[in-house]
């Protein structure tokens, strides 16, 4: 009886994971529908993803943020990669360049999620031009 009245309540971590997954899905749709020209919704998908990461950057830089310093530093490094990849996509659009953004979003969502979605780590040797850090995929 009461089941229809029960509303799903998400924790902050679950909400953040859902937002990252949703953005990853939009980026994947752009990649999957890319023809000889970039999809019309690519700029919006990139803008949304960049906005999400800008908010994350601001939160990570907040002195009141309780996360361990090492974790904050690593997440900030990923945010710089997201910034660079987004700029690269704007300047020289190519569908395969979306993969890194999708992988990062899904990897972070996995870490936030209470229900894992299959995180695996890509060895740094397989991630050219982004330094020696391993990237979650």
Predicted regions: what is each one?
Residues 1-62, 72-137:
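N-terminal intrinsically disordered, cationic/polar leader segments
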């Amino acid at each position: 009886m009461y089941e229809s009245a029960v509303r799903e309540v998400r924790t902050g971590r679950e909400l953040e994971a859902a937002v990252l997954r949703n953005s990853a899905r939009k980026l994947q749709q752009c990649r999957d529908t890319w023809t000889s020209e970039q999809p019309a919704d690519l700029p919006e998908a990139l803008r949304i993803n960049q906005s999400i990461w800008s908010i994350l950057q601001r939160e990570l830089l907040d002195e009141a943020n309780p996360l361990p310093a090492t974790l904050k530093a690593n997440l900030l490094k990923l945010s710089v990669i997201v910034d660079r990849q987004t700029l690269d996509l704007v300047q020289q659009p190519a569908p395969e360049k979306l993969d890194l953004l999708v992988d990062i979003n899904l990897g972070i969502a996995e870490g936030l999620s209470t229900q894992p979605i299959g995180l695996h780590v890509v060895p740094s040797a397989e991630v050219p031009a982004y330094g020696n850090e391993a990237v979650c995929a």
